[in-house]
């Protein structure tokens, strides 16, 4: 096991917001006033940049990091530990490589919201697939972010063989604005042209967890296509006004790179109409029809929240908490569909942050409540293989969830935020 201590101070900030949250002179105790916003935000990109190496790019949002200082004579600092273990896909009991390192981000009295970029290289070989277990720890807060990543080196056309940037910055989620210019770099000069398939379909929102309605399988059926030229393993492309592009570099399958167009507010809510749509999970059918057919979406959504909140102050708090969950869902669960529309997004919005999440290569299980407690319930999501996204999961639906669903929805409709930590 190699262990490195790396102290890095970052002076370039992506965000301009200034905050005095998460500052301590003494070691902080864990206190969750709003668990919905307690998640460490880490975006990851894997790029097979050569035949023998894979670069792991990390982008850490400092919003939920804890900054502290031993006394008033020194700067506030956040300390993060990064640990990984690399396995061969065919033998996960044998460790190929492992590494731990720490870095410290220093700040003055006014802690600015920013993105912290990091990267490290792995020794990998063409023709092999790997499993990377990644643990990122906020040392001051004593909380972990865990992620298991599959490294695909058998398929030279998989998305990990391409790196996307815009304005010379790495894109961690391949989401862009309408008409934005995107640069794509290939790791090898394998082709001179690529096929761009265009998809402009508006995908529906998730059905309730107990629904027995048939869910249409996602079919590969582009609305249109065009050819783009590649020069020196590099090309630029202008994003569509809506929908997404799927770029294929061969004719034998649909593997390739997907680029998405979302509005400028993303991962937040763009307008009052989308606020109405995202509130479908706690609205009755009649309320939803009334709100979606009105000519004044703002008045309709304000009236709805006031009706369940009972007062302006309470309505504002409910609205804030609900749409914060919508935003977090977009950050965490977006695939070819916005995160709030997905199965995981729906569960997160209604039930809040799980007590525990268990992950493996086949999917995830979310636990709400303490283990071995009869009132504890679980949601199981299965990972779906599709050419557009590796973040597509489908809930295993069951009538068992009906009581829990209506209980949680009733919490919201009674003017209370449902959260397993606060029940």
Language model: regions and residue ranges:
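A cross-family detector of function-defining hotspots
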Residues: 297, 305-336, 340, 344-390, ...
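Low-complexity, Pro/Ser/Thr- and charge-rich linker/hinge segments at domain boundaries
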Residues: 152-177, 260-286, 324
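Intrinsically disordered, low-complexity terminal regions enriched in Ser/Thr/Pro/Gly
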Residues: 18-222, 229-231
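Sec-dependent N-terminal signal peptides
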Residues: 4-13
């Amino acid at each position: 096991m190699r262990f490195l201590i790396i102290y890095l101070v970052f002076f370039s900030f992506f965000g301009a917001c200034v905050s005095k949250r998460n500052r301590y002179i003494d070691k902080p105790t864990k206190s969750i006033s709003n668990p919905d916003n307690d998640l460490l935000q880490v975006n990851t990109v894997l790029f097979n940049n050569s035949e023998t190496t894979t670069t792991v790019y990390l982008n850490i949002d400092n919003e939920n990091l804890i900054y502290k200082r031993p006394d008033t004579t020194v700067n506030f600092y956040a300390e993060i530990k990064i640990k990984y273990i690399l396995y061969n896909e065919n033998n996960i009991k044998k460790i190929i490589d492992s590494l731990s390192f720490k870095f410290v981000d220093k700040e003055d009295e006014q802690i600015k919201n920013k993105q912290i970029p990091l990267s490290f290289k792995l020794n990998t070989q063409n023709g092999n697939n790997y499993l990377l277990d990644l643990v990122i720890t906020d040392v001051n807060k004593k909380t972990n972010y865990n992620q298991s990543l599959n490294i695909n080196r058998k398929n030279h056309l998989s998305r990990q063989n391409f790196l996307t940037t815009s304005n010379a910055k790495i894109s961690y989620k391949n989401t862009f604005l309408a008409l934005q210019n995107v640069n794509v770099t290939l790791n090898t000069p394998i082709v001179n042209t690529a096929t761009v398939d265009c998809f402009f379909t508006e995908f529906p929102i998730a059905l309730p967890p107990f629904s027995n309605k048939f869910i249409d399988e996602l079919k590969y059926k582009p609305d249109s296509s065009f050819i783009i030229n590649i020069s020196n393993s590099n090309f630029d492309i202008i994003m569509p006004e809506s929908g997404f592009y799927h770029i294929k570099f061969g004719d034998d399958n649909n593997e390739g790179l997907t680029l998405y167009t979302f509005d400028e507010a993303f991962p937040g809510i763009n307008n009052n109409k989308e606020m109405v749509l995202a509130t479908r999970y706690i609205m009755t059918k009649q309320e939803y029809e009334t709100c979606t057919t009105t000519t004044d979406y703002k008045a309709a959504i304000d009236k709805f929240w006031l009706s369940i909140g009972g007062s302006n102050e309470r309505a504002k708090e409910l609205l804030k908490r609900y749409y914060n969950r919508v935003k977090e869902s977009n950050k965490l669960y977006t695939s070819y569909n916005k995160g709030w529309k997905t199965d995981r997004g729906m569960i997160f919005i209604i039930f809040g942050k799980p007590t525990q999440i268990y992950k493996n290569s086949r999917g995830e299980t979310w636990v709400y409540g303490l283990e071995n407690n009869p009132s504890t319930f679980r949601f199981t999501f299965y990972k779906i293989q599709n050419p557009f996204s590796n973040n597509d999961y489908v809930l295993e639906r069951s009538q068992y969830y009906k009581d829990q669903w209506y209980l949680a929805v009733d919490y919201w409709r009674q003017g209370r935020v449902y959260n397993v930590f606060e029940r």
